[in-house]
Amino acid sequence: MKLYLLLFMYFISAFSFADGVSPDSTRYIYPEDARDITALISNESANAAFVQYWLDPGDSEELTAKLPVTPFELTPPISRINPGSNQTLRIRLMDKSTIPADRESLWWLNVLDIPPVSKTPSAETKDSVQLAVRSRFKMFYRPAGLSDRNTATQQVTFQSGSHSIRVNNNSPYHITITEITLADKKQILHKSFMLQPKSRSEIAVKRAVTRGDRLIISNINDYGGNVTFTATAE
């Protein structure tokens, strides 16, 4: 009896890839005044790849039978990419009436690499397991008229606490914080976190933060790199 299994693997974000299908960035910015943006999808594997693309507004790892409806159009929605070749994926906003104009919006770009199934399987592929790999990447829709993104961290405040700290993001941007250290340069975060625009979050810490402590914070910029800023705990 011949058995073929198709398994799905999910990744919230990817910073490195084995040979296979991968985009040219780990995150994308869609300015409101742009007609569209593009992502270059490359196939570094030895086999042709069949790839499906879509956007979703949440961070769910579930793969549903019906794709979510979004105000964006992706062209093409599915493509075949030969080994060593690439595909330009075009993302275009069709209707912005439902998107907030006073803050950045987060969408997830899904790239599903579907392995081809041989019609005449060999002995090597008999009873084999095939993996369809879904990778997810952040896409930020950025309305015109927002304050300078480079000054967003200046609008983040940190309130002292014993087991957790309160972080207020008064900026209209998403801010991903990967590390917070005190004067002794020891990491106090259990894990990285992303601040929603104009939000307040309670973040667990490994040690107490007292009022007046100088914090050194690492956050991810538009290019996927880590940059630091400082703040004083209130």
For the regions a language model picked out, list residue spans one by one.
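Beta-sheet-dominated interaction scaffolds and their linkers
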Residues: 18-42, 148-160, 192
